[in-house]
C-alpha cells in the first residue's frame, strides 16, 4: 500500500464531484477527449505528409574543406608582481 489507498481515492473523487459538479466534469471529459483526438489526427497527418515527400537530395557543402598552414610561436610569460 502506498500513500493513497483505494479508500482515499474514493474520498477524493467524492470531493471533486461535490466541488465541480457532474455536468462540469462531463464537459471537461469531453473536452479532453476532443483534444486527444485532435492531437492524434495532427500527428497522423504530419506522418502522412512526411511519407508523401520524396527524399531530399543531400546538399553539397558550400565551402570545400581546406588546410591552413600556420606556425606556432613561443610567447614569454609576463613578470609576476609579487
From Swiss-Prot:
InterPro entries cross-referenced by the UniProt entry: TatA/B/E, TatA/E
Region entry Disordered, spans: 43-82
Listed GO MF terms: protein transmembrane transporter activity
Chief location: membrane
Cellular-component GO terms for this entry: TAT protein transport complex
A single BP term in Gene Ontology: protein transport by the Tat complex
Keywords attached to this entry: Cell inner membrane, Cell membrane, Membrane, Protein transport, Translocation, Transmembrane, Transmembrane helix, Transport
Top-level taxon in the UniProt lineage: Bacteria
Membrane topology reported for the UniProt record: Single-pass membrane protein
Transmembrane parts of this sequence: 1-21
A Pfam family: TatA_B_E
Protein's cellular compartments: Cell inner membrane
Quaternary data: The Tat system comprises two distinct complexes: a TatABC complex, containing multiple copies of TatA, TatB and TatC subunits, and a separate TatA complex, containing only TatA subunits. Substrates initially bind to the TatABC complex, which probably triggers association of the separate TatA complex to form the active translocon.
Homology family: Belongs to the TatA/E family.
Chain's role: Part of the twin-arginine translocation (Tat) system that transports large folded proteins containing a characteristic twin-arginine motif in their signal peptide across membranes. TatA could form the protein-conducting channel of the Tat system.
Protein name: Sec-independent protein translocase protein TatA
Source organism of this protein record: Pseudomonas paraeruginosa (strain DSM 24068 / PA7)
